[in-house]
UniProtKB/Swiss-Prot annotation:
Keywords: Cytoplasm, Ribosome biogenesis. HAMAP family: RimP. It comes from Streptococcus pneumoniae serotype 2 (strain D39 / NCTC 7466). This is Ribosome maturation factor RimP. Belongs to the RimP family. GO terms for cellular component: cytosol. The keyword Cytoplasm applies. One of its GO terms (biological process) is ribosomal small subunit assembly. PANTHER family: RIBOSOME MATURATION FACTOR RIMP. It is found in: Cytoplasm. Required for maturation of 30S ribosomal subunits. InterPro entries: Ribosome_maturation_RimP, RimP_C, RimP_C_sf, RimP_N, RimP_N_sf. SUPFAM superfamilies: YhbC-like, C-terminal domain, YhbC-like, N-terminal domain.
Length: 159
């Protein structure tokens, strides 16, 4: 595991328990933006998060990060508590199950029907298999995708 992945896991271990319902921890990213290191913690709730929510969560999360010993951060960083936005990542089976009926983007480790990327409506997620309806040029098609082949999945905006 590389240093950044280790930091993300350490952060997840201390942050996840303090984020209480109705909030949900969606993702954690740590990396350089410009010359600054940024720790981004993506949080959501059913009706969406507000600016006040992010301020309240920052007051809860920031002190908890200071309890990680030894300090895993190699340099100073900015803490960003934010919404995952319209193209929210679907990183768990529960997140995928919650996206049934929605328009999603799925990247695969291995091609199905010579395609490694599908974008369409998630019709079902049962027994570790996604069933999606997508457009192939002008025709609607359905594809079944084993969850084990999914490299990345996220909600998508239909244009």
């Amino acid at each position: 595991m590389d240093a950044i992945a280790t930091i993300v896991e350490l952060v997840r271990e201390v942050v996840e328990p303090v984020i209480e319902a109705p909030f949900e921890l969606v993702d954690i990213e740590y990396g350089k933006i410009g010359s600054d290191m940024i720790l981004s913690i993506f949080v959501d709730k059913p009706e969406g998060i507000t600016l006040n929510d992010t301020a309240d969560l920052t007051e809860i999360i920031s002190p908890v990060l200071d309890t990680i010993k030894p300090d895993p951060f190699p340099e100073q960083y900015f803490l960003e508590i934010t919404s995952p936005g319209l193209e929210r990542p679907l990183k768990t089976k529960d997140a995928v199950a919650g996206a049934v009926g929605k328009y999603i983007h799925v990247g695969l480790y291995q091609a199905i029907d010579k395609q490694k990327v599908f974008e369409g409506t998630l019709l079902a997620f049962e027994e570790d298999e996604l069933t999606m309806e997508y457009m192939d040029k002008t025709r609607k098609k359905t594809v079944r995708i084993p969850y084990s082949l999914v490299s990345k999945a996220r909600l998508a905006v239909k244009l």
